[in-house]
Structures are given as C-alpha cells and as structure tokens.
Amino acid sequence: MATQLDYYAILEVSRTATADELKKSYRKLAMKYHPDRNPGDDAAEAKFKEINQAYDILKDEQKRAAYDQYGHAAFEGGGPGPGGFDFGGGFGGGGLGDIFEQMFGDMMGGRRGGRARTGNDIQTHVEITLEEAFSGVKKDVRVITRVACEACHGTGSDDGASGVEVCPSCHGAGKVRAQQGFFVVERPCPTCHGAGKVVKNPCKVCHGEGTVEKERTVEVQIPAGVEDGTRIRLSGEGEAGGNGVPPGDLYIHVSVTEHGIFQRDGANIYCRVPLRMAQAALGTEIEVPVIDGSRTKVKIPAGTQTGAHFRLRGKGFSVLRSTARGDMYIQVTVETPQNLSKRQRELLEEFEKEAGEDVKQSPEHTGFFRRVRDFFEGKE
C-alpha cells in the first residue's frame, strides 16, 4: 500500500493552523504548482492535486475533525465509501444525523430524503489584476478532472446502459443498514460503493469507472468588484460521477495581485501622491490616474499637509450584488527636497529666517516645541 502523506505536511502548516493560515498557505502553494505555471511538469501536476485534496478536507471543520481523529481512514472508500465519512447534508452516510433519524424519525414525520450523489468537487486557483477585479473579466481556467468515458458513454460497461444492473446487495438504495450497539445506522453499500448499481462486463478503457482523467478548459466570468480570496462556484463543472451520477462542482479561488499605484480597502481605493514642498505650501492642481484607465484633476489647496485626503466620489469599486460604488481617496505625502543647489539652500535659509516662530505659518511645529519647552520648564 502506498504511503499517504499527511495533509498538514502537504499544505506546509502545523496541526494547530487557523483557517486563515490554511487558506494563505493553500493559495501560495496552488499558485506555485498550478499546471499553467508548470506546463509539462508531471510532478508539479501531481503536487497540485495533492494540495487541492488536502485543502478540501482541512478547510471543512467537520472533515478536519474526523481527519485529526482517524487520519486517512476517515475517508477511505472514495469518501464517502465503505467505512468512510460523508459530511455533506449534515453527517450523511452513517453519521450522527442518521443515528438521531433512526431514533426520532417516526415522531418527526418520517425520514428525510437522501442527498443525491454527485461526482467530486474540484478546487482550482486563478490570478487576476486589480484592474480586472475592478471591471470584471472572463478567464479560461485549465483543470485536470475526470470526465465521462466516451467509449462507454459514462456507463462503465462495454455493453452500455444494458450492462448496468441494480445492485443486488442494497437493491438500488446505495445504502445498507447495520447494527451498532443500541443504534441502527446506514452506511454506503460496500458492493456498489453507494452508487446503487453494479457494472457487468466493465469497459476496457475506464475499467468500469465510467470516467477517465482529462484536461479541459472552463470559461469563468469573474464579476466586477470581486475581492482577493473570493471563491466562485460553477455548478456541475466538477468531476463526472460515473455510471450516470451527476458531476460535482468546480470551485475557483480568486487571487488579486498587488498594484504599483492603487491600494484597495473594501469598495474604496487609495492612491498615494507625492507633492513637492512648494506645491503643498502654495497650492496646485495635479492630474491623477483612475483605476478605470482615465485621468482626473484634483485641486490641492495652499498649506496642505502630509496625510491629507481628497475624496473622489463613485470612483471606487462596485459592490457585489448592489448598485453602490465605493470612492477613491487621494492621499498626499509632502516630499522634503534633497540634494539642494547652493541657491536653493540660500533661499530656504532665508525662508526659515523670515518664518521664525510665526504660529500662523507653522501651527503644529510652533505648538509642539512650545509644549516641549513647557515640559522641561516644569521639571526645573
């Protein structure tokens, strides 16, 4: 039996890692080993699959708890399989939900319907720019997944649909009941692994699975206003289930790259603009870029200080599922001149001599040093 790697080791985190630490490490590793960044590298592709499998378990609190207690045995048999756990729909497939349902089902008005089985979900990653997050963008995402076998049309049998029969053990239910102490619990059928069907004369291409591994490209529409770390779900774009089972879902984790000019905070966007000392003192009009590619002019009043903000309404990001928009803020930094010429130094020295202790010209400076003087005088 092949050695199964520890999921925490795969994600390079400790067993006490928080959800945020898991997500951060997952995104970093997914970007590093993504097939698009490592074309033709089978080792990177295998590593990428391991990373997604590990994160799929550890990001779910219930699955993580089961893994911490039972290790890989908690998910043996295809998850859910014989002896494994299925956490969908609230402890389905032999969990606490079935125990309490057996005890109280009749009093509660009968049993609930079983959750429909589907193929496995897929986790992948896409990186976009801040401009693309602002405007929205279509991206082609490459995924390596299992698709319906063309040779048997997904039935798993060389005989097609006629070669698939109702499971004789569970009679098509996909589950069997077993006595555990005082309780009767349901588990996935060990004969058909929960499919409710068995294959006669297995397909020689897919060996009765009904699915084969294949790389395909999926187009995803990333909406305007999407934030870094957003997860987009594409229903039915996951792995095919085989034997007529519906496909799972595709989850795309969006990463927004840092920008050289703009910083985002929610729906608002910030742009830091340096001003020369004379511009800040005398006042000026500057032209600044906007995230949509346009430019706009901003009037800077005389006497502007470092840290001053100027607000441009409606120039920020759109808010998802809303008509609202954020604002853009220009943050001013007054730059002290360096490498002065002799003439510039003389002018500044003359300016300093002229300004002196004029409170009106330098209220913060004058007030601060007055407080310092009072502080030391109080010590004497």
UniProtKB/Swiss-Prot annotation:
Domain J: start-end pairs: 6-71
Placement of CXXCXGXG motif repeats on the sequence: 149-156, 167-174, 189-196, 203-210
Zinc fingers (CR-type) by residue: 136-215
Cofactor dependence: Zn(2+)
Broad class of where this protein is predominantly found: cytoplasm
Positions bound to Zn(2+) 1: 149, 152, 203, 206
UniProt keyword annotation of Repeat present: yes
Localisation per UniProt entry: Cytoplasm
Positions bound to Zn(2+) 2: 167, 170, 189, 192
Pfam families, sorted: DnaJ, DnaJ_C, DnaJ_CXXCXGXG
HAMAP family linked to this entry: DnaJ
Function: Participates actively in the response to hyperosmotic and heat shock by preventing the aggregation of stress-denatured proteins and by disaggregating proteins, also in an autonomous, DnaK-independent fashion. Unfolded proteins bind initially to DnaJ; upon interaction with the DnaJ-bound protein, DnaK hydrolyzes its bound ATP, resulting in the formation of a stable complex. GrpE releases ADP from DnaK; ATP binding to DnaK triggers the release of the substrate protein, thus completing the reaction cycle.
Family to which the UniProt record says this protein belongs: Belongs to the DnaJ family.
Protein name as annotated: Chaperone protein DnaJ
